């Protein structure tokens, strides 16, 4: 049995639960239940505060964890980074009152900065040769300048709307963050095998993100040109049709290039274009 530590609530919790469900790990969580066994897969899920996950994985309370990069870097625990998961993206940034003129990190010299991430902030200031007072608070960091508690803040930024509503502006991005999969350094052979299977499932989900499965009918005389347009995983799949002058073509394309590619296919005579979503992809 492999124990996974995940955040107990919030955006990271929601996106983690979605990933686990897509990976075939089914959970029925009650409000007060902190440890749950999954159905159909040898894992159990431990629900914790995000900032407790790195230590819990490092000391073996949990075998692996899904945690925000901000907490993983801040805590500096001896847990191994296994995989970047690509969701819950945000950034740790410095922000100052919006009307202040900013020309560089020297602005923070002698200032007081409020934060919940003192270790990361201290490292940044030392690299820049800036001496500032760090005021550690937990929660509602963004209000600190407005109530005279600090001159600036160092905090998580997603959309930036919270900064705007508190008359602040972002001036330095210190650490881009996303969800990470981390693991204890001393997992047994059995647990490593379960982790490998879990990674296989996660990667199949990630590879499929932003991809579309395309089926179309193509005139044989234009087939070579159509194949050049379609990227495919290796090469498009070509299937004969009852009409000898036409073939069926199947391929995978990136959604960000979808309309550009579809336009080219139509101009080359492709017909009956069918586009399907892809849930998972094994490569």
Swiss-Prot record:
GO terms for biological process: L-histidine biosynthetic process. GO terms for cellular component: cytoplasm. Transmembrane segments: none annotated. It is an enzyme of class 2 (transferase). Its cofactor is Mg(2+). SUPFAM superfamilies: GlnB-like, Periplasmic binding protein-like II. Pathway: Amino-acid biosynthesis; L-histidine biosynthesis; L-histidine from 5-phospho-alpha-D-ribose 1-diphosphate: step 1/9. Feedback inhibited by histidine. Pfam families: HisG, HisG_C. It is found in: Cytoplasm. Keywords: Amino-acid biosynthesis, ATP-binding, Cytoplasm, Glycosyltransferase, Histidine biosynthesis, Magnesium, Metal-binding, Nucleotide-binding, Transferase. Its EC number is 2.4.2.17. It catalyses: 1-(5-phospho-beta-D-ribosyl)-ATP + diphosphate = 5-phospho-alpha-D-ribose 1-diphosphate + ATP. One of its GO terms (molecular function) is magnesium ion binding. Catalyzes the condensation of ATP and 5-phosphoribose 1-diphosphate to form N'-(5'-phosphoribosyl)-ATP (PR-ATP). Has a crucial role in the pathway because the rate of histidine biosynthesis seems to be controlled primarily by regulation of HisG enzymatic activity. Belongs to the ATP phosphoribosyltransferase family. Long subfamily. HAMAP family: HisG_Long (MF_00079). This is ATP phosphoribosyltransferase.
């Amino acid at each position: 049995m492999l124990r996974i530590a995940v955040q107990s609530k919030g955006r990271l919790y929601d996106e983690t639960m979605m990933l686990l469900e897509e990976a075939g790990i089914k959970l029925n969580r009650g409000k007060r239940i902190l440890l749950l066994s999954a159905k159909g897969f040898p894992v159990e899920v431990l629900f914790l505060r995000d900032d407790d996950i790195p230590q819990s994985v490092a000391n073996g309370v949990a075998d692996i964890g899904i945690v925000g990069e901000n907490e993983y870097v801040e805590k500096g625990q001896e847990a191994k980074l296994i995989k970047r998961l690509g969701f819950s993206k945000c950034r740790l940034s410095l922000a100052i009152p919006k009307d202040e003129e900013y020309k560089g990190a020297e602005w923070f010299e002698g200032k007081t900065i409020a934060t919940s991430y003192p270790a990361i902030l201290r490292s940044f200031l030392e690299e820049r040769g800036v001496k500032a007072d760090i005021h550690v608070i937990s929660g509602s960091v963004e209000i600190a300048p407005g109530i005279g508690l600090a001159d600036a803040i160092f905090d998580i930024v997603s959309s930036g709307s919270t900064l705007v509503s508190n008359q602040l502006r972002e001036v330095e991005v210190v650490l881009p963050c996303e969800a990470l999969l981390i693991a204890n350094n001393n997992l047994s052979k059995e647990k490593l095998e379960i982790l490998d299977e879990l990674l296989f499932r996660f990667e199949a989900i990630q590879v499929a993100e932003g991809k579309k499965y395309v089926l179309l009918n193509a005139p044989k005389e234009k087939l070579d040109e159509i194949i050049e347009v379609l990227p495919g995983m290796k090469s498009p799949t070509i299937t004969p049709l009852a009409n000898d002058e036409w073939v069926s073509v199947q391929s995978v394309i990136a959604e960000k290039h979808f309309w550009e590619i579809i336009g080219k296919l139509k101009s080359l005579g492709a017909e009956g274009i069918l586009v399907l979503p892809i849930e998972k992809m094994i490569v």
